[in-house]
Amino acid sequence: MRGLGTESLRARGALKAAIAAVAGLAVLGLSVSACGTGGTGARDEGPAGSDSVAAGAATPTVSPSKAPKSVDAVKLVKDDPKVGAAVKRALKPCVADEYPVDVSYGDLTGGSADDIVVNVMTCGDAVGIGSYVYREQGHSYENVFRAEEPPVYAEIDRGELVVTQQMYEKDDPVSYPSSEEVITYSWSANRFSEESRTHTEYSNAVGGTDSATPAPN
């Protein structure tokens, strides 16, 4: 994933979601197969006539999941005093009333409602210029995380906050950053704490217009 703005990050998130969905369907298929095969499964363990008893049994109650509320992310960012002035100035519609904002809902802080991750990008090349996490507090939302060093993009991954930042040296083209950091945060004691950090150095000899300069002897 190099110099592709948020497109590669979105693709990575979509791939993870697809893998999780396929795995879930596989487990469901195995469960149905186990119950439907003659001579096997829990239905054969009871006495004769137990099928009619099972049919009349009460259906187990499933705990309702937290349904995400639809939030006006643009207004949330513009009204937030913690958001930098440069990000607010850049947050303008690209086409008609379509803003360059990605919004994700999920459980990051263990609250009663889903948390909201907002990524603000540029219109032309979809480079992330600001990432924020909002936690519901009563009837409003509190900014509990922000990162405003572009290019930056935040995602929810298995209950943790994952922030990707690409870094450029002088004269680096936009499509070829010199390095990238992926930082994982977890929620503890009412704040996000860094759990791990992965740093990747990219080769200047690949994809660039100039050849790599050999190191001096």
Swiss-Prot record:
Position of the signal peptide: 1-34
Region of interest (Disordered), ranges: 39-66, 192-217
Record GO cellular component, one term: plasma membrane
Topology within the bilayer: Lipid-anchor
Record bears the keyword Signal: yes
Keyword annotations: Cell membrane, Lipoprotein, Membrane, Palmitate, Signal
Lipidation (N-palmitoyl cysteine): C35
S-diacylglycerol cysteine lipid modification positions: C35
Cell location: Cell membrane
Biological role stated in the UniProt entry: May be involved in the stabilization of the cell envelope or may interact with the sensor protein CseC to modulate its activity, in response to cell envelope stress.
UniProt name for this protein: Lipoprotein CseA
Organism in which the protein naturally occurs: Streptomyces avermitilis (strain ATCC 31267 / DSM 46492 / JCM 5070 / NBRC 14893 / NCIMB 12804 / NRRL 8165 / MA-4680)
